[in-house]
Amino acid sequence: MNEIDRGFMREAFQQALISYNEGGLPIGAVMVENGAIISAGHNRRVQDGDPTAHGEMDCLRKAGRRTRYDGVTLYTTLSPCMMCSGTVLQFGIKKVVIGEDRNFPGNIELLRSHGVEVVLLDDPECIALMRRFIAERPELWDEDIAGRENV
């Protein structure tokens, strides 16, 4: 992990902590363009009662309308689900940096097969926070993508 990726992943991790402290799923994301964060978000599925309010989706919504996303890098603490991966592909995001895929393998190969550069950091803090959440709140984890194939 280079220092630039480490710094932006720390910001995504801070977003995950916000969600965790609000009683939600600890998944955070930031969008970076030209070395600066243009948007930050976290999973709000529990807080908003919205099953589509994943961390990556919240981050994208906060970025607002844009004509192009090809110069944007998305940092996310957990490997993206099918919905979030599809959104990355739909909007042409060319690079995704992932904190961890141990607690949920996500769709790394799907992204790569469509030409997205994927960097997997295997970040110990991201892994530990998600493991802690799953142990503490398995019923919330099981509501969504947990244990399902191809999501």
Regions from the PLM with identified roles:
Residues M1-E22:
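Short, basic/aromatic recognition patches
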Residues M1-E3, F13, A128-V151:
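Secretory/periplasmic and organellar redox-cofactor proteins
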Residues G7, A36, D58:
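Active-site phosphate/pyrophosphate-handling residues
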Residues S19, G24, I37, M82:
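Short glycine- and Lys/Arg-enriched binding-loop motifs that mark or flank ligand-binding interfaces
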Residues E22-P26, Y69-G71:
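Short secondary-structure junction motifs
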Residues I27-G35:
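Short beta-strand scaffold segments in enzyme catalytic cores
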Residues S39-R131:
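Zn2+-dependent cytidine deaminase-like catalytic core
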